[in-house]
Design a protein with these regions (language model features):
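Extracellular loop and loop/strand-boundary signature of outer-membrane beta-barrel proteins
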Residues: 41-46, 85-90, 132-138, 176-182
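Gram-negative (and chloroplast) outer-membrane scaffold detector with strong preference
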Residues: 30, 36, 59-131, 156
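Cleavable N-terminal export/targeting peptides
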Residues: 1-21, 198-212
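Predominantly the C-terminal beta-signal and adjacent terminal strand-loop region
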Residues: 71-73, 143-146, 151-212
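Short glycine/proline- and aromatic-enriched beta-strand/turn motifs that initiate or cap beta-hairpins
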Residues: 18-61, 195-197, 212
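Outer-envelope beta-barrel architecture signal
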Residues: 20-24, 66-70, 110-116, 142, ...
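Membrane-embedded beta-strand positions of outer-membrane beta-barrel proteins
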Residues: 24-28, 56, 72-74, 101, ...
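Residues that define the transmembrane beta-barrel architecture of outer-membrane proteins
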Residues: 20-22, 48-54, 93-99, 112, ...
Length: 212
C-alpha cells in the first residue's frame, strides 16, 4: 500500500505538468517598424519612417480551457526606423530577443478557431546599427512593450495545427534614453505558425453533435 501511494505521488506531478502544457510550435513572419523621437527641450515629437524586417519565435501554449489559454514564447524580431532629414536619410536597425506572454481568448467554430492575444513583452537588445545624429548612444538593454493581436487556427483531425496572427506592438517604456531625448519603438507584425498539440483532439463545448 505504501509503495502504491509513493508511486502515485511520484507520477501525479508529471501527469499534471503534461496536462498543463497543451501544445508547442514555431512562427515566422514580417515586421513593419518605426520609432518616435521625443525631445524635451524644446518639447517636440518626431515620428520616423518605417523599416521592414523579419520575426520568428518558438512558443508553448498552456492550459486546456475551452475559452482561455496562456501562450509564452521566445521571439527574434527586427525593428528600427529611417530618420529622413534635409541632409539625407539615417537608418536605425535593431535586433531584439523577446520573452512574450499572452492571454489568449478563443472561440471554437466549425472549421477554425478565432482568437485574440494580449500581453507584455520583455525585449532584450541583441544588436544595434543606428546612425541618427541625435541618438548615437546605446539603447536600453531591456525594456517593456505591449502586444495586442488577433489570429485564427485551422481545425484539423491531426495534432498539427496551422495558424496565422497579426500584432500591434507599441513600447510602454523608452527603448532609448538620453538627457534630452527618449525613443520608443512601434511595429506591426504578420506571421504564420505551426503548432503541435501534445494531447489527443477532444470535442469542445462548441463542437456540434449530430443525432440520428
Amino acid at each position: 500500500m505504501k509503495k502504491a501511494i509513493l508511486c502515485l505521488l511520484t507520477v501525479l506531478p508529471f501527469t499534471a505538468g503534461a496536462q498543463f502544457f497543451n501544445g508547442i510550435g514555431i512562427t515566422v513572419g514580417a515586421t513593419a517598424a518605426n520609432q518616435k523621437f521625443m525631445y524635451r527641450d524644446p518639447a517636440l515629437v518626431s515620428k520616423k519612417n518605417y523599416v521592414f524586417g523579419f520575426n520568428a519565435s518558438v512558443m508553448a501554449e498552456m492550459t486546456s480551457y475551452d475559452y482561455v489559454r496562456w501562450v509564452s514564447e521566445i521571439q527574434f524580431n527586427q525593428k528600427g526606423s529611417v530618420d529622413k532629414r534635409e541632409e539625407g536619410s539615417y537608418a536605425n536597425r535593431l535586433q531584439y530577443l523577446s520573452w512574450n506572454n499572452y492571454l489568449k481568448i478563443r472561440y471554437e467554430l466549425y472549421s477554425f478557431i478565432p482568437y485574440v492575444l494580449v500581453g507584455p513583452r520583455l525585449d532584450y537588445t541583441l544588436t544595434q546599427a543606428t546612425s541618427s545624429p541625435d541618438a548615437l548612444g546605446s539603447y536600453q538593454p531591456l525594456h517593456l512593450s505591449l502586444a495586442v493581436g488577433a489570429g485564427a487556427e485551422l481545425i484539423s483531425y491531426s495534432r498539427w495545427k496551422l495558424f496565422a496572427e497579426a500584432f500591434y506592438v507599441p513600447d510602454v517604456m523608452p527603448a532609448y534614453t538620453a538627457p534630452n531625448l527618449h525613443i520608443t519603438n512601434k511595429d506591426f507584425e504578420l506571421r504564420v505558425g505551426l503548432k503541435y498539440n501534445l494531447h489527443e483532439n477532444r470535442e469542445s463545448c462548441n463542437t456540434p453533435v449530430y443525432v440520428e
